């Protein structure tokens, strides 16, 4: 790629800066880490790898990067694309072959959403492989919009206020998942992917499914953002600014013990002169 335009340079710097801030804020990568970068062939994971490779060069710490792709044996999957791309970059990589496609097609009725089962099978396989290669961190390409969408999905359909944290220790206790693009918008990532002309691999398994719950939420947020620019960022900031005493979760705040403080200074209000 030739010389970047002013706007392209700003975009690249913004993504690198935001990823660096997220990594620092959540202590995602530490000196000596071996980071397994999960590469799906989509715009998000390509951008994540690109940004991490840059940060690896300029960071004050030393860490390894190993790219890993999972070949789920989907029909028409272009097996040559990622190896060719990663060889050209000179990045260490592994292709993990696991026929989860057949499992998903067998267990999920025709017309039903495959995303949930597919994701669980893929995640379990990657956790195991991360352990095998001694990876200390597993990097996923989820961005700010993914995190906000997940928050609303859980609220609307699961009755829970939870999202997709920038850093997570897996239930097995042996894997730490990080999301370096947590502060980055999907719009910026899409623009960067277009600019870099990454060799995108579409998902034949779920990409053609319509009316997914996530797509409904995504469309809602896009419409909100169109009418009120900055709303998605505001919602994301809210996830970083939780006030348990202003919600209703008894496990997070002790409401049962609340009572007046006899030693508190009385507040007098002259209601007649308001």
UniProtKB/Swiss-Prot annotation:
Organism of provenance: Pseudomonas putida (strain ATCC 47054 / DSM 6125 / CFBP 8728 / NCIMB 11950 / KT2440)
Main location: cytoplasm
Protein name as it appears in the record: tRNA-cytidine(32) 2-sulfurtransferase
GO MF annotation, one: magnesium ion binding
Pathway noted in the entry: tRNA modification
Needed cofactors: Mg(2+); [4Fe-4S] cluster
EC number: 2.8.1.-
CDD domains tied to this protein: TtcA-like
Cofactor descriptive note: Binds 1 [4Fe-4S] cluster per subunit. The cluster is chelated by three Cys residues, the fourth Fe has a free coordination site that may bind a sulfur atom transferred from the persulfide of IscS.
GO biological process: tRNA thio-modification
Keywords: 4Fe-4S, ATP-binding, Cytoplasm, Iron, Iron-sulfur, Magnesium, Metal-binding, Nucleotide-binding, RNA-binding, Transferase, tRNA processing, tRNA-binding
One Pfam family per UniProt: ATP_bind_3
Protein origin, superkingdom: Bacteria
Positions of short motif PP-loop motif: 40-45
